[in-house]
Amino acid sequence: MPVQAPQWTDFLSCPICTQTFDETIRKPISLGCGHTVCKMCLNKLHRKACPFDQTTINTDIELLPVNSALLQLVGAQVPEQQQITLCGGCGAEDTKHYEEARKCVEELALYLKPLSTARGVGLNSTTQSVLSRPMQRKLVTLVHCQLVEEEGRIRAMRAARSLGERTVTELILQHQNPQQLSSNLWAAVRARGCQFLGPAMQEEALKLVLLALEDGSALSRKVLVLFVVQRLEPRFPQASKTSIGHVVQLLYRASCFKVTKRDEDSSLMQLKEEFRTYEALRREHDSQIVQIAMEAGLRIAPDQWSSLLYGDQSHKSHMQSIIDKLQTPASFAQSVQELTIALQRTGDPANLNRLRPHLELLANIDPSPDAPPPTWEQLKDGLVAVKTVVHGLVDYIQNHSKKGTDQQQPPQHSKYKTYMCRDMKQRGGCPRGASCTFAHSQEELEKFRKMNKRLVPRRPLSASLGQLNEVGLPIGAPDEGPMDLPPRKPSGLPNGIVPGSSVTQLISRSTDSGFESVLKPVKLDHLSSSAPGSPPELLDSVPKTSMSALPVNAHPAASRDLPPLPVSKQIQMVPRGSQMYAPPPADTFYQECRGAGPPFDAAPYAQGVYYPPQSSQCVSRFVRPPPAATEPATAYLDHYTPYLQDRVVSTQYGTPTQQYQAIVPTQYQPHYDNRRAYPSNAPPYQREELVRASPVPLEMPPAAVSPYVAESRERYQGIEGYYTHPGQIRPSYHREPYIRLPPQHTAQPHPSLDDLHRRRKEIMAQLEERNVISPPPFAPSPTLPHSFHPEEYLDEELKIPGNFKGNDYSQYSPWSFDTFGPYIGTKDNKSKDVSAGGNVEVANVDGKSLRDQRIELQRRATEPGEDDLIPFGDRPTVSRFGAISRTSKALYQPPGPMQQAMAAHGAAKSSITDYSLYSSHSGLSGPSYPTHQNLPSQGHLSERERLSKPLPTSEREQLRMELQQVNQQISQQAQMRDMEVATNRLLLREASSLGNQQQPPPQQPPAKWPSKVSSKQLSLELHQVEREIGKRTRELSLESHSLSMKSKPDTIKVENGQLDDLPLSFSSEVPNGSGLTQDITLSKTASLTLSEDPQAGGDKSDLMRSGVNSTAAP
């Protein structure tokens, strides 16, 4: 197969002695046949004939003029005047025409000047010529013509015509849209019943056709097509009989077959003898496609042809030769007409119409070899015309073209010009010239090596940062410049420990397969030589399914108003191994895994919030399968999950509700294979304006990380194999993306009153859960509430239509489910599924540590010792049900004396506050936990150690300060609401006066409380609610009186008969009309429960001091 032939580029040296021309003894002498030889070699010839083609030299060698055009290219001194003796009948006019023609050739040769090197060998790519390689080849042919001899003049005229025709093609290409070339070409091919299947598949199909017919056998079209399809299917499954039949039709159209017709049967096709090699068959195939393009009026450059048909740039000369052979005398004139049409379409800004007379003159030249020799005047006119059109092309490319010479550059790849060219080092010149993919100078080498570092393929910025957040690697600030990824072999990830950091990095023990898909195919190397903040060498190998495995911020707009993340922050992870704690960190900082809330301003909560030192910050990333969300009708309201008895949620800015479908127990599979990737971890996708779980942008600060751990269920997914998440079941999985907040919500300067109430409620829930001691989790108490709360026991906020259907499956806990108890007691399940939960650290990987950690600590309190029965190796043993514990088989012990003592406090109290005993160890709502530093590596704590830890003062101070700030915000929002209330009442009064009837707002059904609450508590709560409602009513009355308005009968009855003047507008903004009452009731319930608990972490005065009772609205 012919490839790029570089011989024509050695035009500055003698082809016999291979020495560079000079002006002394190696003067270049051009012969009539078009070859140029130095004068020394020419004098050594035995006969007066060209040594290459044996063409007779008619003129005396001493009378042949020196090629001055080549001399000026090698930098030699050009003789000013040469004594030229023309034919005997030539006069002074002919000599004048000859001199003009020679000067035209010398001027055109100057376009080849950048191609010459100091030694005169090959090309120099550092100063690339403005002309394309086909133009350069044709120009070299013209320069080698000997104008003195008759044959040389004929060749010069043909070269001038060819150069002019190529100039027209170049101008047409400059006016074409390259994006439409391929589509127009394949449309023209398909219109003729043919097809091109792509470079690789087309080559295989042609080779299979040749394999079937190269021995001269005759096959019918149907048999030939079936043979090719059967052989192509293993490698190209998309091959079909129709497509292969179109390829055969293309060869049939190219007359490659000898067809034998048969009566009443299909014809037999036999490959012609001249096409029984692949090179010949492929050349005819390419010629047919080029001919179809020419018939369709398409002008395609050789480099474009090489890319289209072969997928590379090494077949340009092959395609150029095909184009040249397909040129006809009429094609030049047709090209001039096409150029005229293109200029009319574009308006001809460069005034290229002035070239049309010269182009028509060149088109009228007879290109046949038998044409009569031109006169000296015709030679002069032709060369002047070609000089004019070439100058016009160069001027257009330099001044008016949008492409310039960039289209001549080969496509850059990862190693483009990153090594020195061997020919340039050894010979001092490269025959490939500008198309060489190797560097020709040290400056060029360094330039492209630097560019190659920046051109390493990587993910988009948001995806890259999201991936870095998932694997817990440092992220640089936006102004750090380009991110370099030096090619180096990354090291492995031994046992989940990321090496190279000052603090041991840990990876979550969650059995979520989406997170494992991030770790397994990716080999991290934290110690790369790139700058701090640059990403590691893992972006290309990370599967796309892991992009949403760790949702950090469900609302990307929430981080726009936050300060940028410092570069020095080390974002750490918690591993799957047995190493549970970083050795020396003073504080542990946990991230809210439920996503940030609406984009509040960070200022209201910035004052008094404790931030740990940067050197020991450890932000855990949590894996949670995204739930199947059902979008409500009011899509832009901020709905929040209400506080339930076994779930503690607290976040710094409020957390949006995760809206789940109803949980149907029949949906669960018998076992959950943690090695399979379920669709719950699918990558985020965008559908119109609906966006879900987009990665954290670059400006994600630590301020958005809540110091409170939310409940999560991934910690015990191996145990929960009996009852898996509905989001992990593919047949019944349904995903609805979150709806982005509208602009008016994103510009909200302060949190709303509802959000502040919810925030206060969450803080109260934190304090409540921190001070209530629960009974042992494995005691089969009949009063344990079902984890799936019936609808009548849920708060009113759960009953919003469209927001919650059934129950929130994130409330599910295997320990509170009735049917799970028998499985815990069986020994067989200990060694299989249940044992997956035996290796539970106190590392708080997810929010599940609120109850799961205590289970683990109670179990290990009675263990005889470490690794006494199952001494496994260093690496974790993983079964298809999860990690196998490295501890003894005494997984679940009967409750000890301390547990029995705790169980005596009553089932009603324990059922509400279950799984919240060891919040001081779990890091629920405080960033500083000194107990972490005292824990052994395997997490073994005695019961006495756990119960003797009081609630840290810093945590209470933080909660108290935050609660004060929330109360201040509530007061501010309440004042704003009151102003709106007064205005709405005025409007309602006018409407009622017109309609003489006003429909009161629908009364909400009274809140149904769990039956476990005592009557004494209810009476106290009602008393406090009455005081609060009276205070609220007086404030509203004073506000109404100040605005000269009377109170309206828009009231809402509550359980005790008091009136609360809440207008319609207020009820429509809150999820239900009694949101304030519920908030107050919840806060009072929390304070009452805490005050009656004798074994809480602090007494009543402590609760008052930490802000528990200061919950009344101002």
From Swiss-Prot:
Residues 329-401 are annotated as: HEPN-C. Residues 179-328 are annotated as: ROQ. Pfam families: ROQ_II, Roquin_1_2-like_ROQ, zf-RING_5. CDD domains: mRING-HC-C3HC3D_Roquin1. It catalyses: S-ubiquitinyl-[E2 ubiquitin-conjugating enzyme]-L-cysteine + [acceptor protein]-L-lysine = [E2 ubiquitin-conjugating enzyme]-L-cysteine + N(6)-ubiquitinyl-[acceptor protein]-L-lysine. Keywords: Cytoplasm, Metal-binding, Repeat, Repressor, RNA-binding, Transferase, Zinc, Zinc-finger. A zinc finger (C3H1-type) spans 415-443. GO terms for cellular component: cytoplasmic stress granule; P-body. SUPFAM superfamilies: CCCH zinc finger, RING/U-box. Proteolytically cleaved after Arg-509 and Arg-576 by MALT1 in activated CD4(+) T cells; cleavage at Arg-509 and Arg-576 is critical for promoting RC3H1 degradation in response to T-cell receptor (TCR) stimulation, and hence is necessary for prolonging the stability of a set of mRNAs controlling Th17 cell differentiation. Residues 918-956, 994-1017, 1031-1051, 1087-1114 are annotated as: Disordered. Zn(2+) 2 binds at residues 33, 35, 50, 53. Residues 918-930 have a biased composition (Low complexity). The record marks 509, 576 as: Cleavage. SMART domains: RING, ZnF_C3H1. Residues 130-178 are annotated as: HEPN-N. GO terms for biological process: 3'-UTR-mediated mRNA destabilization; cellular response to interleukin-1; nuclear-transcribed mRNA catabolic process; nuclear-transcribed mRNA catabolic process, deadenylation-dependent decay; positive regulation of mRNA catabolic process; post-transcriptional regulation of gene expression; protein polyubiquitination; regulation of nuclear-transcribed mRNA catabolic process, deadenylation-dependent decay. It is an enzyme of class 2 (transferase). The RING-type zinc finger is required for proper localization to stress granules, but not to P-bodies. Post-transcriptional repressor. May recognize and bind to the 3'-UTR of some mRNAs and promote mRNA decay. This is Roquin-1. It comes from Xenopus laevis (African clawed frog). The lineage of its organism: Eukaryota, Metazoa, Chordata, Craniata, Vertebrata. The gene is rc3h1.
